[in-house]
Amino acid sequence: MERLVCVIIGYVCGLLQTGYLYGKWKHIDIRQHGSGNAGTTNTLRTLGWKAGMITFLGDFLKCVVAVWIVHILYSQAYPEELALLSMYAGMGAVLGHNYPFYLKFKGGKGIAATAGLIFATNPMMMLIAAIVFWVIVGITRYVSLGSLTIVVLFVVEVVLYGQ
């Protein structure tokens, strides 16, 4: 039951669509421009650096907040399961970001939210991921390749180290 509660907590946190809300503030539906995505990269390309950074921060923090709430709720009762429950909350936040019910399940791609999950569960891995991301993007000029590489690294880290 705790796992389901953590996913729901995460999903609710993930529903905050920073790019969509910023776009609405500027009288633009970000999903009608660029790639049609409500995430950081499309917001950056469509509305500029300021909007992109605000969106990144909001998308990043939604996972951090979800994990923080789970720590507050479960650290005393389930200390041995806290890492797992944190992952459930973080993955719920990514799902809420990618599939917000109030936007007909059309959100972002979850990269900034996943970065927040990596940071919240393993800050050292986040440092490594950021370096790898920027090296790949710097060499290839493809944000998507850097993003996919980070997701793969995170999955490998979780499988190998159980984090």
Language model segments and positions:
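Alpha-helical transmembrane segments in multi-pass membrane proteins
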Residues: 2, 6, 10, 15, ...
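Alpha-helical transmembrane segments within multi-pass membrane transporters and channels
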Residues: 9-30, 54, 136, 140-145
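Cytosolic, membrane-interface loops and tails of multi-pass inner-membrane proteins
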Residues: 20-51, 107
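Interfacial segments of multi-pass membrane proteins
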Residues: 44-49, 70-74, 110-140, 152-162
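A cross-family phosphate/adenosyl-ligand binding-site feature
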Residues: 55, 77-78
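Membrane-helix exit/interface motif
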Residues: 68-77, 99-103
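Interfacial loop-to-helix junctions that mark the boundaries of transmembrane helices
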Residues: 78-84, 118
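Membrane-helix interface "capping/anchor" motifs
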Residues: 100-106, 135-149
